[in-house]
Amino acid sequence: MRDRWLKRAVGARHYRPWLTERGSLTRRLQQHSRQFAVQPLHLARKKPPLAEAQLLQVLPRQHTLQRDVILRCDGEAVVFAHSLLPQQAMRGTWRGLGRLGSHSLGSALFADPRMCRGALQYKKLSPQHFLYRLAVAHIPAMRGPIWARRSVFRLGRKAVLVSELFLPSVLKLPLINK
């Protein structure tokens, strides 16, 4: 089964401003909360699914570091984030990305002016999608389809794939800090 993602956030309506933001999601969430937090859920070496391996330009049998976190604003879960970092990318400038703990990956990526972000891709995930299943294992209250986006960040030949699932609670966030 092919995992088709869209080049535009067609049909996303209320989620579109969140999905299409090309800047740091961490910074944007901080503007909408008094207390922003990263809740680490899972960190492990794994073989990536075929679609993700293709985006990262690695063989599906090559191990990647998989990191899953929940981004929280004032205690409320608003985004489930899933990132994959090929083993060979964890050297040099990005060697610390595997040890972020409760620190934001976005802050680390956007701190380097040499970093290039690839095109954003969008998808309304059904409960059958593997990313949805990853998220619902940690957020059992999730119901119905969830909008997500993904993109590849590159620094030279190194790449990291970041997928973000926007929970309905993100739509209720007030603007607190400009």
Swiss-Prot record:
The keyword Hydrolase does not apply. Its EC number is 4.1.3.40. GO terms for cellular component: cytosol. Transmembrane segments: none annotated. One of its GO terms (molecular function) is chorismate lyase activity. Gene3D superfamilies: Chorismate lyase-like. InterPro entries: Chorismate--pyruvate_lyase (IPR007440), Chorismate_lyase_/UTRA_dom_sf (IPR028978). GO terms for biological process: pyruvate biosynthetic process; ubiquinone biosynthetic process. Keywords: Cytoplasm, Lyase, Pyruvate, Ubiquinone biosynthesis. Substrate binds at residues 67, 105, 164. The keyword Heme does not apply. Pathway: Cofactor biosynthesis; ubiquinone biosynthesis. It catalyses: chorismate = 4-hydroxybenzoate + pyruvate. It is found in: Cytoplasm. It is an enzyme of class 4 (lyase). Its main location: cytoplasm. Removes the pyruvyl group from chorismate, with concomitant aromatization of the ring, to provide 4-hydroxybenzoate (4HB) for the ubiquinone pathway. Belongs to the UbiC family. PANTHER family: CHORISMATE PYRUVATE-LYASE (PTHR38683:SF1). This is Probable chorismate pyruvate-lyase.
